[in-house]
């Protein structure tokens, strides 16, 4: 939530759109803080759980690539914290970004989460000893890039992929962070920590999550973007 709050307007009348809201982990909390929050979720089951929470969130079923319910330049802040995991082509990812851009106010900000390629290769490929099998069946190519299909549920990207989506959608980066840092590599160690040591780890993560040399190595990144000022690029 630290980076959501960093880019939220102080004015509680600010309008937030949570695309791929799931069961409302972020949208419900933001609504409880007094913000005007709208949630879009593709999966009916998740949407049902969200609505049962009886929050002030306005929740609808919908697709990240088609936000036709909403007007142009309607929202101050947009969260896309799930859809990019499950969109498998560059075209679809760019379409989701372009739709979010359309409903974003000119001075607004979008936070977009991605699953990262290297985490998948290192953990499932090497740690769990599937690397040779995956390379033989084409799930991981000769450049160690994951090649998922829809049946695999998740898509994985590298930083250069994220850059290409932003370029295609004419968005520019404010900053990019590692959402998890090294934590998903060391869950048993974290679970065994005493509270003081764990809090020190959290402090470490927050102090390093913006370091570019670490961003692509974690399991997830959050890209924080805004509309590109094309005058700067002329």
Identify what each model region corresponds to.
Residues 25-66:
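Class I SAM-dependent methyltransferase SAM/SAH-binding core
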Residues 110-138:
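Conserved class I S-adenosyl-L-methionine
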Residues 174-234:
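A C-terminal cap/extension of S-adenosyl-L-methionine-dependent methyltransferases
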Residues 20-22:
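Class I SAM-dependent methyltransferase "Motif I" SAM/SAH-binding loop
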Residues 68-78:
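A short acidic, Gly/Pro-enriched loop at the edge of an enzyme's catalytic core
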Residues 94-106:
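A short glycine-rich, Lys/Arg-flanked "PGG" loop and its adjoining helix->strand segment in the class I
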Residues 153-169, 176:
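Short alpha-helix
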Residues 1-12:
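Conserved alpha-helix/loop element of class I SAM-dependent methyltransferases that forms part
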